[in-house]
Structures are given as structure tokens and as C-alpha cells.
């Protein structure tokens, strides 16, 4: 593979985008290209079929081969997040949020939604998405000291578990 920018490019690829295979080795550039293209076209096929758009398997296969060849030769590149996550089980199991670079959440309805904005911010941050927000909800809520006995909360050690824990904590000070 002609990395184009010397050893630093290859180092960056293996450090950032190459995924560990089932045998414990890291993906080669060819492995990554196949994963990314198969991932992209599987999402495209699922979307097309669920949206009642005609799916031509033969045409898609030809396009996938052309895209893979061009990607392998660095004639085009997906976003870095596409190299990192496309074609992984994470996208099918957890959704495509990790393919996004940035997101936005409004606080305008914070008095009705309480912890929802904060939970979204944490959830997206935990998959590497930068999250912007406004201050339209400023002054709409006030924190209170929780009353009664502390409640034991068992936190699943997962992204979803920690997001739920944050929501419970924030809500305990806003109810």
C-alpha cells in the first residue's frame, strides 16, 4: 500500500482505524476497505428496502467493487468515523450515532424534559460525538436537595447504564 505520506500515515491508520480481527491481529488496509464498503452497502440496502426503493443487487455489487478499488487506491476517503465504525457490529447493535462528528441539543424544554438534554449529551460524547447546546433553558429550573433516604442504584457498566445513572442523578436534584 502506498500510504502517500510515509510512515506517519501508516502509523495513524493502525492506531486509529484498523480494528482487531477475531484472530487477534489488526486489519490490513485491504481488510478495512472491505469492512467499510460492505458496511456502507448493507446500510444502503436496508434503507432502500425499508423505504420501498428498488434495490438492484447486481448494480450495487458493481458499484461496491468500484468504490472499494478507488478507496483502496486512496482516490476517495470516507470520514474518519466511517473508517473507524462502518461495517462493525456496533452500528447494527447500537445505531449509527458513532458515524457522526457532531450533534446539537436544545435546552429550551428543559423544564419539561429535565435530564433529557444532559443524557443525550453524555450518550453522544461517549461514542465520540461532539455536542453543541444552547442556553435557552437557562433559569427555567432550580436544583433542590434530594429528600429522604438515598436510593441504591445498580449501574450497568455500559454506555447506556452510565447515561441512565446520570439521568437519575440529575432528576433527583430537579424533581
Could you say what each language-model-derived stretch is?
Residues 1-175:
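Extended catalytic cores of very large enzyme megasubunits
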